[in-house]
């Protein structure tokens, strides 16, 4: 009875939550009765904590509405429900493809004299990219959680997994981390990572060498295929055709696919609608630019790995001024470390100002409140005067709140200074706007997309 009630509760949650929230947090749960208690099994600690924190009140309220005082007790656990557990399957009879940088090779199904056969010696999974050294924050926690679940259960609920976001935000790191996780759990797994251009090149070589059937057999036999920057398939009709059939074959065999792009699937121009539709069959997750706390954590982790003692105030100084992506942060820190090693000077704020003066000057020039206001007004198609006016209609108030939140995140101005720039508003109005937009970014896919697009525009 209670398990049936849980199925009804799932229907309620599916109506109330966004498709991404439902796929991410509710779909992986399994339910089973234990006496008078309904046990919900989550695949890992992250999902368990999130559901218990965000959704337990909704679940309990539904149970009470349906059964009153007879509603079952609720308990959470990690793993699969006992009745669902099955004997471990035999290891996959497949070949792990070594990194091309290593000299070792294993048996192949291709004739290695053929150019296309090079695919047989390339997993390209970088062992240095692990979940343990991926710095997590609000901007990427959904992506990491999804990647962890795929690593634990490849070919399961999130297939395909589609990660999108700007350059240098950690999408590639997560791809490799998943690959390393899969190989750790099953050393025989055939996991292949590549850039989309490499897939195109391999197909062209196969056509030139009359080896297209071998090409098809290879790509359709892998246990997991990870393709970076799928947007480069744009306007390559033959490549899209071949990938379409490869995609279908892998999904039919429950083999994992992970794709990345710099934009939301439906916004990729030059890619067939049937492919874009399939990209959204599993789970689509945005990887956003890191917020201040995450940027600081990235700098501290990188400095620690380099054996450098980076003072907290210096990390905050850099993180507050360089905001666009992880790659830029790491590049800036590498420059600071190199300068410090060369000159023998201690790493202070004044030293960093000098070492990064060109980068800092460029950032300060690019991102101003005025620039943010103009960009947001143009994006939402409202007048600049409306941004500063007292109008409270949603069509004006929401863009104004977005612009205030962006001003807090992307500039070094204080809340009172931001308020002054928006028509002399009080700092509490700015604070409310920032909190409101932060809430909406979790609840509304459209606001989340708008905010990410605006950050990309302002940071480019």
From Swiss-Prot:
SMART domains: AAA (SM00382), Bac_DnaA_C (SM00760). It holds the Pfam family Bac_DnaA_C. Keywords: ATP-binding, Cytoplasm, DNA replication, DNA-binding, Lipid-binding, Nucleotide-binding. GO terms for cellular component: cytoplasm; plasma membrane. PANTHER family: CHROMOSOMAL REPLICATION INITIATOR PROTEIN DNAA (PTHR30050:SF2). Domain I is involved in oligomerization and binding regulators, domain II is flexibile and of varying length in different bacteria, domain III forms the AAA+ region, while domain IV binds dsDNA. Coiled coil: none annotated. Residues 84-123 are annotated as: Domain II. ATP binds at residues 168, 170-172. This is Chromosomal replication initiator protein DnaA. It is found in: Cytoplasm. Residues 341-460 are annotated as: Domain IV, binds dsDNA. NCBIfam families: DnaA. Residues 1-84 are annotated as: Domain I, interacts with DnaA modulators. Its main location: cytoplasm. GO terms for molecular function: ATP binding; ATP hydrolysis activity; DNA replication origin binding; lipid binding. Residues 124-340 are annotated as: Domain III, AAA+ region. Plays an essential role in the initiation and regulation of chromosomal replication. ATP-DnaA binds to the origin of replication (oriC) to initiate formation of the DNA replication initiation complex once per cell cycle. Binds the DnaA box (a 9 base pair repeat at the origin) and separates the double-stranded (ds)DNA. Forms a right-handed helical filament on oriC DNA; dsDNA binds to the exterior of the filament while single-stranded (ss)DNA is stabiized in the filament's interior. Residues 103-123 are annotated as: Disordered. GO terms for biological process: DNA replication initiation; regulation of DNA replication.
């Amino acid at each position: 009875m209670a398990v049936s009630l849980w199925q009804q509760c799932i229907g309620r949650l599916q109506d109330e939550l966004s498709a991404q929230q439902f796929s991410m947090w509710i779909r992986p749960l399994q339910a089973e009765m234990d006496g008078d208690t309904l046990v919900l099994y989550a695949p890992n600690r992250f999902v368990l904590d999130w559901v218990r924190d965000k959704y337990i009140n909704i679940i309990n309220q539904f149970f009470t509405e349906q059964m009153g005082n007879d509603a079952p007790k609720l308990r959470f656990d990690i793993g699969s429900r006992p009745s669902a557990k099955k004997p471990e399957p035999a290891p996959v009879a497949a070949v792990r493809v070594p990194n091309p940088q290593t000299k070792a090779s294993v048996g192949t199904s291709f004739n290695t004299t053929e150019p296309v056969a090079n695919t047989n010696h390339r997993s390209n999974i970088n062992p240095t990219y692990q979940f343990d050294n991926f710095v997590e924050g609000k901007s990427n926690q959904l992506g990491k959680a999804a990647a962890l679940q795929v690593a634990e259960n490849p070919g399961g609920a999130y297939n395909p997994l589609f990660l999108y976001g700007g350059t240098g935000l950690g999408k590639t790191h997560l791809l490799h981390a998943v690959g390393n996780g899969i190989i750790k759990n099953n050393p025989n797994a055939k996991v292949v990572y590549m850039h989309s251009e490499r897939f195109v090149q391999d197909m062209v070589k196969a056509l030139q060498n009359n080896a297209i059937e071998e090409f098809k057999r290879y790509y359709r036999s892998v246990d997991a295929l990870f393709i970076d920057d799928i947007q480069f398939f744009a306007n390559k009709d033959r490549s899209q055709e071949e990938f379409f059939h490869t995609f279908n074959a892998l999904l039919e065999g429950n083999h994992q696919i992970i794709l990345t792009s710099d934009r939301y699937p439906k916004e990729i121009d030059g890619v067939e609608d049937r492919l874009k539709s399939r990209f959204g069959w599993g789970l689509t997750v945005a990887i956003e630019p890191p917020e201040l706390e995450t940027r600081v954590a990235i700098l501290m982790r990188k400095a620690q790995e380099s054996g450098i003692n980076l003072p907290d105030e210096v990390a905050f100084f850099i993180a507050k001024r360089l905001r666009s992506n992880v790659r830029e942060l790491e590049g800036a820190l590498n420059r600071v470390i190199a300068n410090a090693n060369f000159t023998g000077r201690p790493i202070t704020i004044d030293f960093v100002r000098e070492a990064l003066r060109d980068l800092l000057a460029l950032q300060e020039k690019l991102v101003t409140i005025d620039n943010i206001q103009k960009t947001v007004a143009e994006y939402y198609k409202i007048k600049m005067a409306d941004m500063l006016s007292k109008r409270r209609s949603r069509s004006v108030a929401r863009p104004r709140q977005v612009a205030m939140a962006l001003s807090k995140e992307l500039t070094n101005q204080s809340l009172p200074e931001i308020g002054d720039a928006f028509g002399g508003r009080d700092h509490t109005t700015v604070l409310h706007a920032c909190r409101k937009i932060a809430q909406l970014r979790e609840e509304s896919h459209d606001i989340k997309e708008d905010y990410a697009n605006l950050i990309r525009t302002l940071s480019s």
